[in-house]
């Protein structure tokens, strides 16, 4: 399942700065998070300890549950657990979140109400019953997840109707100038404004 692969890639990316972003030795110790930096209603299992070893263990559990979701093993339970761990991880350090993190959490939420393990999964292969579900499925969750993804494109198109995109073409330059979002390649491309 592609959603589980995205979760695994996200975990791998976050693991590169695990100590800096998720331990008490990093940029946001638990004491600072609890004292007002984060939302008081955000509860995170990652707040149980600020030790690096505990965070590594939580990342490993999150990864194992994501692998179970990818394989389609006990898909419903795996989806709920992956959503819980993803939201918990995001709540641990709200300073480093982007819109993609919110979208991932929402897609995982709606996936809890969809038959994610109905096809191409261990759950589907283990279904020994004579009754096989139809390939057609519609529910509120189906409409919601499609609407959620569709709105990303609609609002992106609306935002790109500004003259900065169509007349002077400087939007890409400005986007790559944001240090928090730009990668090494982005910083390199800033040396060639004619390409942008």
Protein language model annotation of sequence segments:
Residues 1-196:
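Alpha-helical membrane-anchoring segments
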């Amino acid at each position: 399942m592609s959603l589980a692969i995205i979760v695994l890639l996200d975990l791998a990316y976050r693991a590169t700065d695990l100590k800096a972003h998720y331990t008490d030795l990093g940029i946001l110790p638990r004491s600072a998070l609890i004292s007002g930096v984060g939302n008081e209603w955000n509860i995170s299992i990652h707040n149980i300890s600020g030790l690096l070893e505990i965070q590594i263990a939580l990342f490993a559990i999150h990864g194992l549950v994501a692998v179970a979701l990818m394989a389609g093993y006990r898909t419903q339970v795996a989806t709920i657990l992956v959503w819980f761990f993803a939201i918990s991880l995001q709540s641990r350090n709200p300073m480093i979140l982007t819109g993609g993190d919110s979208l991932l959490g929402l897609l995982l939420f709606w996936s809890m109400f969809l038959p994610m393990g109905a096809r191409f999964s261990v759950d589907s292969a283990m279904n020994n019953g004579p009754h096989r579900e139809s390939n057609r499925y519609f529910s509120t969750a189906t409409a919601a997840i499609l609407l959620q993804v569709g709105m990303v494109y609609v609002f992106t198109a609306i935002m790109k109707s500004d003259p900065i995109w169509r007349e002077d073409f400087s939007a890409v330059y400005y986007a790559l100038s944001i240090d928090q979002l730009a990668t090494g390649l982005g910083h390199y491309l800033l040396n060639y404004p004619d390409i942008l």
